[in-house]
């Protein structure tokens, strides 16, 4: 049995030194991912440290949920791989939650700036902010094609005429952009 396996068993039994060992063992990974969020998501300078604390809490939860009875986990490589992938998933969840928090704060500030009677305007502005955020992962051409296609209800032939290119090229750009958007959502 590896030292990591023994410490995970001790950690699941509440041993503080084992928890400390596991945190130290994966500290490099945690430090890497605490900095991996987009700058737009950070609200202040303390967010990076908050990210680290959230990842440490996730690590402890992950370790406590490892099915240690499974003989596969006696192999240290399997344990490290399991923890690594679980931390990646936790990071993705944190990213989604921080985006939701950011949208909520932005919408609250918009709502406070616009009077109550202008609710449709607030919803229109909020949806435009969300669309612009989603399109940031695309190239300029991909953004244009998606905006023409879905926001302006243009056909691919019309977009090709506007951009001075072929319909097939527009279709290819649209499909590439949609794949990127699916991956980022």
UniProtKB/Swiss-Prot annotation:
Keywords: Antibiotic, Antimicrobial, Bacteriocin, Plasmid
Pfam families xref list: HTH_16, Sigma70_r4
Transmembrane segments: none
Transferase found in the keyword field: no
GO biological-process terms attached to the record: defense response to bacterium; DNA-templated transcription initiation; killing of cells of another organism
Gene3D superfamilies for this protein: 1.20.140.160
Inducers of expression: By UV irradiation.
Record InterPro entries: HTH_dom_conjug_TS-like (IPR024760), RNA_pol_sigma-70_dom (IPR014284), RNA_pol_sigma70_r4 (IPR007630), RNA_pol_sigma_r2 (IPR013325), RNA_pol_sigma_r3/r4-like (IPR013324)
Superkingdom in the source lineage: Bacteria
Entry GO MF terms: DNA-binding transcription factor activity
Keyword Translocase: no
Matching NCBIfam families: sigma70-ECF
Function: May have a role in bacteriocin secretion or immunity.
Name of the protein: Bacteriocin UviA
Native organism: Clostridium perfringens
